[in-house]
């Protein structure tokens, strides 16, 4: 009996702060994302843009987007396409229109030099007012196609930083939970992390049934 009580207490402690975080952003606020020509959006709050329709919608509060430069420059026979690595941008926004532009460059040589840097001077604004943001240049993997599994790389980055997105809304795991997860494994396939993710995506009724099942183990 003591073992059952301990198991229930363990799961309540494990998910308690997470459940609270999941209900932080219950009211949807109209925040749309637009970008300058040549700035490609790859992910919005953990969801691939292949699964989203435009204009992309953000939430009131913490947001994360993955973007890269994908731009044609030059004219005629000298016209070429330049690409940067994907960058993870994090920021907080309120209602309105959020706009992202890339730093300017005149030719491919300038672009290549700019893309070598770990950070770029992205121009991020909400309702025409500049806002602060964090950025991380995704390193990619070794080989000919370093970003072919970008979704897995993003999930691993978020896991190691204690960030999870449920239904397009950000959930931050507690520092203790995030540290514990990182120490146990650096893979996204951690059973503990899978359990956290599954619990976050449950309805209230499913959570009650789950906790009932846990108490019976």
From Swiss-Prot:
It comes from the Bacteria. This is UPF0319 protein VP1009. Belongs to the UPF0319 family. The lineage of its organism: Bacteria, Pseudomonadati, Pseudomonadota, Gammaproteobacteria, Vibrionales. It comes from Vibrio parahaemolyticus serotype O3:K6 (strain RIMD 2210633). Residues 1-21 form the signal peptide. Keywords: Signal. It holds the Pfam family DUF2057. InterPro entries: UPF0319. Coiled coil: none annotated.
């Amino acid at each position: 009996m003591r073992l059952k009580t301990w198991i229930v207490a363990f799961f309540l402690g494990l998910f308690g702060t997470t459940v609270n975080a999941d209900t932080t952003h219950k009211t949807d606020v109209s925040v749309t994302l637009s970008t300058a020509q040549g700035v490609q959006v790859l992910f919005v709050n953990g969801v691939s843009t292949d699964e989203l329709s435009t204009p992309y919608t953000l939430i009131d509060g913490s947001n994360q987007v993955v973007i890269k430069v994908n731009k044609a420059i030059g004219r005629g026979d000298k016209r070429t396409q330049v690409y940067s690595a994907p960058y993870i941008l994090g920021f907080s926004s309120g209602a309105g229109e959020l706009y992202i532009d890339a730093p300017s460059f005149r030719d491919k040589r300038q672009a290549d030099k700019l893309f070598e840097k770990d950070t770029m001077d992205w121009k991020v604004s909400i309702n025409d007012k500049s806002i602060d943001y964090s950025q991380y240049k995704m390193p990619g993997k070794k080989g000919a196609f370093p970003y072919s599994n970008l979704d897995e790389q993003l999930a691993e980055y978020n896991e190691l930083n204690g960030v999870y997105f449920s239904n397009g809304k950000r959930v931050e795991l507690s520092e203790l939970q995030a540290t514990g997860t990182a120490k146990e494994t650096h893979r996204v396939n951690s059973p503990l992390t899978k359990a956290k993710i599954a619990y976050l995506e449950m309805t209230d009724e499913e959570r009650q049934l789950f906790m009932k099942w846990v108490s019976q183990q």
